[in-house]
Every structure is written in structure tokens, then in C-alpha cells.
Amino acid sequence: IEQDMRKVFDDKKIDAVSIATPNHWHTLAAIWAMAAGKDVYVEKPGSHNMFEGRMLIEAAKKYNRVFQHGVQLRSSLAIQEAIKHLRDGLIGDVYMARGLVFKWRPDIGDKGTEAVPEGLDYDLWTGPAEMKPFSRNYVHYNWHWHWNYGNGDVGNQGIHETDLCMWGLDVG
């Protein structure tokens, strides 16, 4: 296991990588990997914003690499079967879909700033994001709720529901 992904990208024995980092790293990590000759799969969301998404497309073309982004529900046999039933007309002509999330999330509170814990390379973790004083509010799962690192629940959970709706309607 490597703490610095660039060491993995430099390894000529590796053909492809899967990127499952906080969202703010997705684009730069994928571009570095493609520049190093790797094909790339990135977990949702593919990028932190639209501009970065366009950069990923350009990089895949420039380096002639395969780039894929996805959500795990696409791999569910039950969901695949449900989508097939929709497309076969089991419930009629589907013209609209709504994705809903009913998931209570506890308040993460304000943990304030503190010294960086031993073993965490905070400069590397922060990467392309704006450097801020370390707070436990920014790491582990909590990074989702800060724009510097995540996309809130839209980029965390909403993307699953949106993808299901688009897939079911055969528009994405």
C-alpha cells in the first residue's frame, strides 16, 4: 500500500487504476494516471465540477486512455433486472422519474482546528484543494460536507438516485 498515489502511477507493471479518494482529488489523480499510461476507473462523482469533467475527457483523448466513472448500483443484478423490466414496458411508458433520499445524517459539529495527527500527510491529503488549518471536520467521512473536498449529499448520495432515474429512462 502506498500513501502517495504517484508512486503507483509510476509503476510500469500497473496497467489500470481505480480512484476512490475524496472528490477533490478525482480529476487530478485521474489525469496523472492517464499521463502515466494507465486506464482509469473513478468512483462517483467523476469530477468535482463540470470544468474538471471536461478536463478528464480532454486528458483521455490526449493520452489515448480509457476513462470510466461509475456508481456501484450499475453492478447490481437486481437493479439490472428492474431496468430491463422498465425498458420491456412492464409498467407502461415511463416518461418521468424522481430520485428521493430519506437518509438522516447527524450534525458533524465544529471540531475546531488542531495539530495534524501523526501518520497523516495533510499536505498530500489536501492536494489540489485550498490549504486550510487541519480540522477533523475535513477528514474521514466529514470531507463530503465541505466544498473544498466534497459535493455535499448531492455528490455523495444524490448521484446514485439521479443515475438510477437516468438509466431507467434510458437517457444516461
What is the role of each PLM region?
Residues I1-D4:
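Conserved SAM-binding strand-loop segment of SAM-dependent methyltransferases
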Residues Y63-H69, L73-G172:
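Predominantly a Rossmann-like dinucleotide-binding segment in NAD(P)-dependent oxidoreductases
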Residues P22, T27-S75, G89:
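Beta-strand-loop-alpha-helix segment that lines the small-molecule cofactor/substrate pocket
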Residues A16-S18:
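N-terminal Rossmann-like NAD(P) cofactor-binding module of classical short-chain dehydrogenase/reductase
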Residues R6-F9:
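Short loop/turn elements that flank and shape the SAM/SAH-binding pocket of Class I
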Residues D11-K13:
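Alpha-helix C-terminal capping/helix-to-coil transition sites in glycosyltransferase folds
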